[in-house]
């Protein structure tokens, strides 16, 4: 067999009745790409909740019976480039990015990823992550760990509210998630937001203090609402929040939202990336994300506050902001654990456990 003909192994599923598995296909590296595409040999890919959420929601009658590949975040090396590809993307370049798809035959938990760098954005050249001598991870692991979560956090802060100042105040529900990790670093180091309050378990408070939160409130010691209310009255001089960002799925503040969120006229926002209820990742249903209450909050013209569903928005240039923050040392992608390719099931189980503190990454090389 020619060296240009390789076996491409990918982690795939067909629908929500089939398990995730490794499938293999023959790939001719001489002809598998178009003139405007590149072939990336993937070194690492990160898992995100969207991976097993889409798996569990995949009805074969609606979404077909073809293999669908896991993951969106990736890092790797360009090994082929079509003749019409912009010359900023060359063979040998180390790149990372987010390959957006819902039920794509192409995904990033694969050994070879084919994409159009002009359309399949964001993609960027990898930057070196500042590391100490005992750091166990290489740059490919770090590079795969941040695009989707960083992009979600940046888009939440950038796309809805434009007038952040040192007097601004933000409440983060779910301070320990990877999105919230990026959120607090972006809020403090890029937008220079004055006060960021986080809600997390009492056991996570010491860890999260080091991330840049100004104040932390436990959700497992009394009422969340009452605990935040006390902080607001005693420490924040009863000032309300410019944004409440929810990364876990919560509805506790809705009945008393006017006590915590500034008026709609002041350009305040409630932004969720997880819906109004915490999802059980082992038993996902469409109702967890497309509930009647969520729809009403989104379309109700009479509600007294701005409610939005957050998601990464590649055109806002978050990938370059992330690169700059990484180079400056103001953001370092958090890694929970790293698995080899054939340990993909353990990696998925780790993320589904809700115990991961940082990104779960799978290595191909």
From Swiss-Prot:
UniProt superkingdom: Eukaryota
Subcellular location per the Swiss-Prot or TrEMBL entry: Lipid droplet; Mitochondrion
Which family does this protein fall into?
Belongs to the YIM1 family.
Chief location of this protein within or outside the cell: other
Q: Which UniProt keywords apply?
A: Lipid droplet, Mitochondrion
Which organism's genome codes for this protein?
Answer: Saccharomyces cerevisiae (strain FostersO)
The name this protein carries in UniProt is: Protein YIM1
Gene3D superfamilies in UniProt:
Medium-chain alcohol dehydrogenases, catalytic domain, NAD(P)-binding Rossmann-like Domain
* GO cellular component entries: lipid droplet; mitochondrion
